[in-house]
Amino acid sequence: MAVNKEDIKKLREAQSVAEFPVQGLRTNQDGAIKANSITNVSLILQRDPLLAGKIAFNEFTYEIELLQDLPELMLEKGPIDDDYPPALLGYIESKYGVMFADRLLQGALVNTARKNVFNPVLDYFEDCYANWDGKIRADDFLPDFLGVERSAVTALQTRLFFTGAVAKAYKPEMKFDYVLDLVGGQGAGKTTLLKKVSNGWYTDQFTDFENKDNYANMLRALIINDDEMTATNNSSFEVLKKFISSEVMEYRKPYGRSTVRRAKSFVMARTTNEVTYLKDKTGERRFMPNMVNKSLQKYSPVTDLTQDYVDQLWGEFTAYYRDKNFSFQLDEEQEELLNQNRQSFMYIDAEEEAIEVALQTWNDDFITSSDIGDRIGAGDLVNNRRVAKKIKYVMDNRKDWAPSHRKFGKATRRGYRRLQ
């Protein structure tokens, strides 16, 4: 019986491939594994006994990660950085006798990871919610650990901010423009508290809000902290407002070929030891100040803020997020509560203080800018545009006076009317 050479060739190729622990690999005519096949690299990453199920895409950080330590390759779990591909390529070459190009491995890592997606933050929140004991801790969190006043506004601000963090994890595209400010109390552990409660998803490594090199780092965090307000002080107020209210961040990764657009999936906190730090009256509604008092602390964030306590907090905040009655849309009473709290942290310069005195001692319910100018000794405002602009700026942002006009004979004068 004649032997078909083609049948023998196919048999040898099948025997060669069968020797490998991963089946289905594409081979050359001589039975060797094809080195120019991204499919082969992907199959090895997905089916090799050592590598299978270990490579995944982190949906929160947008990074490819190794889910477990690989001591055989001296690789640790976590984001796959530039040190990992050489180890993986070396392992594949030694086991399969084929050396793949780095670009093929990079593509295969993406293909493999995208088939194994996870979100560690959502997994964490779900676990915290499932194990929450039902006890309310939010209202006492800042008073107990930072000595903040135990009040309705503290409770409101705490619930808003941390429930906002949960919401941004579940729905990054959601608009959330509140900022938690921890003020004063030097040495009380403000930064430590934020780090611990962030459960590892934290960064304070940025110095402004315009350098897009910072964005990738921010997007790996749940809470970003402008520590000592370094970035705030390095930015104009307009830039700060734009950053806080933005919903999408656009940047280019190092060595990236295209621009990346990501929904802003974090919330922002700030720390400062300067008490009267709110200097702009036009956009301060975004900020929620909390006065820290070290002498009133019951517990230390450094030694007493345990993982179990943090887990219970997030379980509670996740419960608020799930509660259909919870809303980030504040009613008038809540808005006024936040506004009154902010007044204690407003910076007032000498001219603003003089304007305040002028208004408090004015007996009529109507006043003009010229009246105010006379009272504070500014003289004719026609020749003093700087003070005229300052008066307008102050009056336009007061809640107890509103723009109005009054007739004096046949003439009408513009000014402000006191609200009852």
Residue ranges and their predicted role:
Residues 88-91, 144-148, 186-194, 230-237, ...:
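Generic detector of short, locally flexible boundary/turn motifs and exposed helical patches
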Residues 50, 54-72, 144-145, 168, ...:
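Residue-level preference for alpha-helix termini and adjacent loops
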Residues 112-220, 370:
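P-loop NTPase catalytic core of nucleic-acid-dependent motor ATPases
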Residues 1-134, 153-156, 382-389, 419-420:
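N-terminal nucleic-acid engagement/recognition segments and initiation subdomains in replication
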Residues 97-119, 175, 205-206, 211-236, ...:
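Feature primarily recognizes SF3-like P-loop helicase cores of small DNA viruses
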